[in-house]
């Protein structure tokens, strides 16, 4: 019986610890108004689960902030969009995550909404 409990405990620990916040490859839609079309590019971003809790009794002295899987370090890469008009700026700069962690959502650099547009949204259609 103790062996079964130990196995269950191990698998629960593994599910919590090993499925955490980590780098993952994603495809995003890139668009520029001057070019009037979208292309898909591959980049690296953060995804996974972070330990969080929602207290039953709220303490106004200690605000309850939910932690999300977000970037700790990032770099920017620039590409040239093919097929843009010659007079337009055809360069596009996008973020690439290099390190992730569980932290507070920074609304200055991240879409913190419950249901954002998503990485594949394109206002021009593909």
Curated annotation (Swiss-Prot):
Where does the UniProt annotation place the signal sequence?
1-19
A GO molecular function term, named singly, is:
follicle-stimulating hormone activity
Q: Which keywords annotate this record?
A: Disulfide bond, Glycoprotein, Hormone, Secreted, Signal
User: What InterPro entries is this protein classified in?
Assistant: Cystine-knot_cytokine, Glyco_hormone_CN, Gonadotropin_bsu, Gonadotropin_bsu_CS
Q: Which domain of life is it from?
A: Eukaryota
Q: Which Cys pairs does UniProt list as disulfide-bonded?
A: 21-69, 35-84, 38-122, 46-100, 50-102, 105-112
**What PANTHER family is this protein classified in?**
FOLLITROPIN SUBUNIT BETA, GLYCOPROTEIN HORMONE BETA CHAIN
General function of this protein: Together with the alpha chain CGA constitutes follitropin, the follicle-stimulating hormone, and provides its biological specificity to the hormone heterodimer. Binds FSHR, a G protein-coupled receptor, on target cells to activate downstream signaling pathways. Follitropin is involved in follicle development and spermatogenesis in reproductive organs.
Complex and partners: Heterodimer. The active follitropin is a heterodimer composed of an alpha chain/CGA shared with other hormones and a unique beta chain/FSHB shown here.
Q: Can you say what this protein is called?
A: Follitropin subunit beta
Q: Which organism is it from?
A: Phodopus sungorus (Striped hairy-footed hamster)
**Which lineage?**
Eukaryota, Metazoa, Chordata, Craniata, Vertebrata
């Amino acid at each position: 019986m103790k062996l079964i409990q130990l196995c269950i405990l191990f698998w629960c620990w593994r599910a919590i610890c090993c499925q955490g916040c980590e780098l993952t490859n994603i495809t995003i839609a890139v668009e520029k108004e001057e070019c009037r079309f979208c292309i898909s590019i591959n980049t690296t971003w953060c995804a996974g689960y972070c330990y969080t809790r929602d207290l039953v009794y709220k303490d106004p002295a200690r605000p309850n902030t939910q932690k999300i899987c977000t970037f700790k370090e990032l770099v920017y890469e620039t590409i040239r969009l093919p097929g843009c008009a010659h007079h337009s700026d055809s360069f596009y700069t996008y973020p690439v995550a290099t390190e992730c962690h569980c932290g507070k959502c920074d609304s200055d650099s991240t879409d913190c909404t419950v249901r954002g547009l998503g990485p594949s949204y394109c206002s021009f259609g593909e």
